[in-house]
Each structure stands twice: as structure tokens, then as C-alpha cells.
Amino acid sequence: MKNIPGLRYLAILAMVCCFFLNFMIYREYGASLQAKPEGTAQVAQKAEPEAAVPPSNGELRRPAEYRGIYLHNYSARMPKILADYVTKAKQHGVNTLVLDMQDAVYFRPGEIPQQNVALCLSNGIWPVARIVVFPYGLKEYPVPQSLIADRMALARKAVSLGFREIQFDYIRFEDSGRLRQVGQEERYRMVEGFLSNARRELSAKGIVVSADVFGRVALNRHDPIGQRLEGLDNAVDVILPMAYPSHYTWSRFMIANPYYTLYKSSVVARDRLKKAQLVMYIQGFEMRVAPSGLSLPVYIAHQMQACVDARIGGWIVWNAAQNYGPTWDALKLMAAKSPIPGIEAARAATAREERSAESQATGTRTPATKKRTEGNRA
């Protein structure tokens, strides 16, 4: 009986922890679950409908120009939440939803109801299943075959649910200098081999295969993470560089000029690819937006317009917190008859930067070129 006070303490602590956990879950998801969005797309009334035959592709084809947003696994699993995004997507001209097949913390599979994928298809929305291959990059080599088998099993599961595209992310080596014993060409062979094998199997079922790559891979060659555009061009149908301006920390100019960053990355990558469709992931979050002097909606719209001007295969907005209010506002700016605020100045700055780069390449440096070069040293 001497342990009773201790047991009471543990019981009270457990109750407090449970209360806190429930509070956090409600704060994160409760409002969206209780509120019925205006104009929500129709969803099945049954909570757990019987499994149906996966919907056929019908007339829905891979978009010639992707206009998409990313949704994490929780949003993808909840019918009411997903229906709200489908409704907003249709209202604003979004034709693609990238849905996580795994949770974002432990990368464990999270079951997406088949009816949710069918909802996308029936509303003309292209559903893409995102699968993280090597969380935060490959840390051991050779690659465990059990891991490869697990990822391919998840891809097959996505196909059975009706997904029309499998998007592999984190298909790279860790960006930390580990595994130095693995040579550059071997890294390429591993990454491209996995994707080629996946495509060989999935394309036989009419499934599109895509891969996310670092934004810098669009601009460089011989990247140690094992990604190169020329090799991936033969391994997948769609390549998606994650060209978030906030991540180009070596260039103040690229951080402060989202139009230039996306336009430059898009044009260089476009000219290097011969087969694969090029789609850019663009930044839909606040990180390092301030140096641009733009509001977030305008910042996003500049990136969208850069993709249009570069004549590539579209864009997908990334916001891990699912805060897409600024993205909807950006799309309103894109649809408006009046020019996007600051877009002409951004185009002019891009043209000047391109001329400066040409001057550097030919060795004819001007004072303006020298100033810009020094400004790029972050």
C-alpha cells in the first residue's frame, strides 16, 4: 500500500497527458472536422463504404500543365477535408492534388479511402500519390532490399486505390557527406535504377511515374546526392525540382527575387530535358519572403508566372501546414485582368541578371556585374 501515492501521481499525470494530447489534436484538426465548408464537393454518406473496383482513368489524362497543391496524409484520409480542397481546387483552376501515402513523422503508410481518390477523379482532379523512398536521404548502402520491396508494395497499393500517378520523393543520398565510399556514378545508377525499375512495372498498368529532385539539381551537374536531370530524363515521366527561393541561401538575389529563381531554374532544366515533363514545386510558405518586399500571395503568383513564361509543364505549391489561403489569393491575381503587382519589374530584373551572367561568361565585366556578383555571396 506504500506505493499508492505514487500510483495516484502516475494516474494524474496520465490524465493530464491525455487531455493535452486531445487538445492538440482538436486544435490541429477539430475545426476543419466540425465545420462544413461552403460548397463542399459531394462525398459518400457512408463512413466506411465497401471497397469498389478502382475507377478507370476514363477521359482524365495527365495534365499538359500541372496546377497543383500538396496535401499531407491526414488531409488525404479525411473525406470532408479532402472534399473541401477539391471544391476550392475547382474554384481556382487547380487540376492536381498530390496526396501523401505516408504520415509525415514516421513515414508509416496511412490508409487513404478509395472513395477519396474517386472523388478527385470524378471532379476532374488528377490524383498523385507521393511516396517518400529514403526519409531525409539514403544513409546506408547497399540499399536493403526489404526497403525497396516496401516502397514498391506501397506504390502498388496506391494504384489499387485508383491513383494515376506515383510520385517518388527523397529518392537520393543524404546531403551530408556520408557514404563517401560510394562513387558518383554508383549513386546515379542506384537512383536511376530504382526509378527505371518502378517505371517499368507501373507503366505497364498505365501509371505515370514522377520524381522530386532538389531545386539546385536544375542548375548544377555532378550533385553528390545522386540526382542528375539527364539520367532521370530516361527514368521517369515527370521531373519536379523543388525550387523554393528561400532555400538558395548562397544567393541573396535568388532569395529576394522569386520570379527570377523559378524562371532561371525552369529554363535551364527545360533545355536539359528531352523526354520528361518538367513541373516545378514552388514555395507557398513564409520562409525568407521578407527580402522580396512582396506579400506571400504576390510572392507565390510571381513563381507561378515564371513557370508560365518559361513554357514548362506547370507547378505544384508546397505548404506543409496546409495553409493555402495565400495560394488561392495568388490564383486570383493570376486570373485577374490587371497585371500581377511587381511582375514587370521582376521580368526586367531577370533580364538584367541574364545579361550580367552573359557578360561574366564572356569576361566583359561591368560595374553593375561586379556589384551583382558581390551581392550573391551569401
What is each of the regions a protein language model found here?
Residues 243-244, 258-259, 276-353:
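Substrate-binding cleft of secreted/luminal carbohydrate-active enzymes
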Residues 81-105, 160-166, 238, 307-315:
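Catalytic domains of carbohydrate-active enzymes, especially glycoside hydrolases
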Residues 70, 128-135, 188-226, 273-286:
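Aromatic-lined carbohydrate-recognition surfaces of secreted/lumenal glycan-active proteins
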Residues 96-133, 176-209:
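Aromatic-lined substrate-binding rim segments of carbohydrate-active enzymes
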Residues 98, 151-185, 316:
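Active-site groove signature of glycoside hydrolases
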Residues 61-70, 74-79, 112-122, 126-161, ...:
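Active-site-adjacent "subsite" loops/lids of carbohydrate-active enzymes
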Residues 31-89, 211, 283-285:
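Boundary/entry segment of secreted carbohydrate-active catalytic domains
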Residues 99, 225-259, 318-323:
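Aromatic- and acid-rich polysaccharide-binding/catalytic face
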